[in-house]
C-alpha cells in the first residue's frame, strides 16, 4: 500500500532538489540538464520509498511528457522559422530598416512596445519571440545594446499578450477553470497590469539612455553588408504579416508556423533566388549560414534551424518528466494542501495562491499546471472567504503565466533562452513586467485595491 507524502517529506525532497539545481547552476556553472536528471532519479527513489510502483513512475513520466508535446513541436518549428526567414531575407530586411529608423536610446522601450502590440494581436508569446523578437534582438546586437536588456524587453512585451490578449490560451484557460467570464477576467487584470507595465516602460526608458552603443560608422558598415548580401524588399515581409494575420484569426499555432515556413521558402526562391532544395533542407536542419563580410551581421543572421532547438527541447523533456514524477508521488498535492491551512484573510489567500503557482512553476516547469492545480485547490476558499473568484484567475495569470519564463527549466524559459540566445539568469533582472505583476497582485490583495466580494460578483451576473 502506498504511503502519503508528509509536509516534512515534501520539504526535504524539494530542499534537496533545489540545493542540487542551485549549486550546479550558480556554483559549478553547468547546464541544468544533468542536475535535473539527478533530481529525477532522487524523486524516483523517494517515490519507491513511498511504495509507488516503478510502472506507475514510468507512466507518470510519460504523462508529464504528454503535456509538453505541443510546446516541444512549437519549439522545433520556431527554430525552422528563424532559419528560413534568415534565408528568405525577412529578418535581414527588418534588421536593415530597424537600424535605419530606431535610435539606440529608444531601442529598449521600442522593442517592449512593438512586442507588446504583436503579442496582443497574436495572443502568443512564442510566436512573438520567434518572429519579431528575433529581429529586435538582431537590431539590438547591431546597435551595441546589452543582449540581456534587449531580451528582457522582448520577453516583457511578448508576455503582455500572453497575459492580456483574449486570443491567448492562458488568458482563456485561467478564468475557464474557475468559472470566471473571460472579459471580466481581462478587465480585472488591468488593476495589476497597468501599473506593472507603466513602471516597466519607465525603467526601460531610463536604461535606454544609459547604454553604450555602436558608432554611426559601424551601423553604416552593417547596412552596407546587409544591402550587398540580401535582396531587401517589402515582399520578404509578407511571410511574417501572414503569420500575424492568421494568429489574429485564431488559427492554431502549429499550422500558422508551418505556413510561415512554407511562405518563407517561397520567398527565398523568388526574391533571394535561392532555389536549391538540398540547401533548403540543410538550412532547415542546421540553420542559416553566410559570410557577409561583417562580423556583427554574421553573428546575427547565422542562426536558427531544428538543431538549434535541441538544447531547449531536451531540457523541457527532462523537466516535464521530473514534474510528472513529482506530481505522481503526491509532493504537489501535499504542498498545496499545506498552504490552505489557516487561510483567514483575503490577503493571505491571494498570497498563498500566488506562492503555489510560483512553486508549481519551479517544481514542474509547466505553465498550465501552475494555473490548473492551484486554481482547483484554492477555488472553494475564495467562495468560503467571500472573495471574488476573478481575483483567483488574476493571481493565476500573474504568478503562473508570467513566472514560467523566469524558470530556466520552464517550458517558456527554455524556449526564450534558446530563441533569443540569452540565458534566463541573464535576462531575468530586466524582465521587470514578469516579476512586478505577481508582486502587485499580492500587494493589492493585502491593501484591498482592485478586489471585490463574491456576493457582488454573483449579483452582477444575476
Swiss-Prot record:
Pfam families: Na_H_antiporter
Location of the protein in the cell: Cell membrane
GO MF annotations in UniProt: antiporter activity
Membrane topology: Multi-pass membrane protein
Keyword rRNA-binding (UniProt): no
Top-level taxonomic group: Bacteria
GO terms classed as biological process: sodium ion transport
Sequence ranges on the Cytoplasmic membrane side: 1-6, 51-71, 119-125, 209-228, 272-306, 374-401, 451-462
Topological domains, Extracellular: 26-31, 92-97, 146-188, 249-250, 327-353, 422-429
Keywords assigned by UniProt, alphabetized: Antiport, Cell membrane, Ion transport, Membrane, Sodium, Sodium transport, Transmembrane, Transmembrane helix, Transport
Annotated TM spans: 7-25, 32-50, 72-91, 98-118, 126-145, 189-208, 229-248, 251-271, 307-326, 354-373, 402-421, 430-450
Recorded GO CC terms: plasma membrane
Job description of the protein: Na(+)/H(+) antiporter. Involved in pH homeostasis and sodium extrusion.
Family, as annotated: Belongs to the NhaC Na(+)/H(+) (TC 2.A.35) antiporter family.
Listed name of the protein: Na(+)/H(+) antiporter NhaC
Amino acid at each position: 500500500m502506498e504511503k502519503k507524502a508528509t509536509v516534512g517529506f515534501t520539504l526535504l525532497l524539494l530542499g534537496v532538489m533545489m540545493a542540487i539545481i542551485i549549486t550546479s547552476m550558480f556554483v559549478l556553472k553547468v547546464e541544468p540538464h544533468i542536475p535535473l536528471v539527478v533530481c529525477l532519479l532522487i524523486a524516483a527513489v523517494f517515490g519507491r520509498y513511498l511504495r509507488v510502483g516503478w510502472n506507475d513512475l514510468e507512466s507518470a513520466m510519460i504523462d508529464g511528457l504528454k503535456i509538453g508535446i505541443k510546446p516541444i513541436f512549437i519549439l522545433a518549428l520556431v527554430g525552422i522559422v528563424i532559419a528560413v526567414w534568415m534565408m528568405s531575407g525577412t529578418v535581414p530586411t527588418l534588421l536593415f530598416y530597424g537600424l535605419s529608423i530606431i535610435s539606440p536610446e529608444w531601442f529598449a522601450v521600442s522593442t517592449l512596445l512593438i512586442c507588446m502590440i504583436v503579442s496582443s494581436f497574436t495572443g502568443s508569446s512564442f510566436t512573438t519571440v520567434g518572429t519579431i523578437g528575433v529581429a529586435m534582438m538582431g537590431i539590438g546586437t547591431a546597435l551595441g545594446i546589452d543582449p540581456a536588456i534587449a531580451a528582457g524587453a522582448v520577453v516583457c512585451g511578448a508576455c503582455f499578450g500572453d497575459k492580456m490578449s483574449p486570443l491567448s490560451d492562458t488568458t482563456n484557460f485561467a478564468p475557464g477553470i474557475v468559472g470566471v467570464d473571460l472579459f471580466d477576467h481581462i478587465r480585472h487584470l488591468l488593476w495589476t497590469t497597468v501599473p506593472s507595465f507603466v513602471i516597466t516602460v519607465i525603467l526601460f526608458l531610463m536604461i535606454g539612455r544609459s547604454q553604450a552603443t555602436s558608432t554611426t560608422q559601424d551601423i553604416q558598415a552593417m547596412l552596407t553588408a546587409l544591402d550587398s548580401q540580401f535582396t531587401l524588399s517589402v515582399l520578404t515581409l509578407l511571410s511574417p504579416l501572414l503569420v500575424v494575420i492568421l494568429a489574429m484569426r485564431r488559427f492554431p499555432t502549429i499550422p500558422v508556423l508551418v505556413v510561415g515556413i512554407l511562405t518563407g521558402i517561397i520567398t527565398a526562391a523568388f526574391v533571394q533566388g535561392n532555389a536549391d532544395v538540398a540547401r533548403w533542407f540543410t538550412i532547415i536542419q542546421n540553420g542559416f549560414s553566410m559570410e557577409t563580410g561583417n562580423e556583427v551581421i554574421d553573428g546575427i543572421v547565422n542562426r536558427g534551424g531544428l538543431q538549434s532547438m535541441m538544447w531547449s527541447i531536451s531540457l523541457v523533456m527532462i523537466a516535464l518528466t521530473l514534474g510528472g514524477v513529482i506530481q505522481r508521488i503526491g509532493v504537489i498535492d501535499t504542498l498545496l494542501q499545506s498552504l490552505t491551512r489557516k487561510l483567514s484573510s483575503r490577503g493571505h489567500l491571494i498570497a498563498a495562491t500566488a506562492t503555489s503557482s510560483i512553486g508549481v512553476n519551479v517544481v514542474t516547469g509547466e505553465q498550465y499546471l501552475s494555473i490548473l492545480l492551484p486554481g482547483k485547490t484554492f477555488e472553494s476558499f475564495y467562495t468560503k472567504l467571500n472573495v471574488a473568484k476573478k481575483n483567483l484567475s488574476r493571481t493565476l495569470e500573474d504568478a503562473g503565466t508570467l513566472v514560467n519564463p523566469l524558470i530556466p527549466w520552464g517550458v517558456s524559459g527554455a524556449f526564450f533562452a534558446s530563441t533569443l540566445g540569452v540565458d534566463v539568469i541573464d535576462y531575468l533582472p530586466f524582465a521587470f513586467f514578469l516579476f512586478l505583476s505577481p508582486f502587485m497582485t499580492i500587494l493589492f490583495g493585502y491593501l484591498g485595491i482592485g478586489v471585490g466580494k463574491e456576493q457582488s460578483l454573483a449579483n452582477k451576473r444575476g
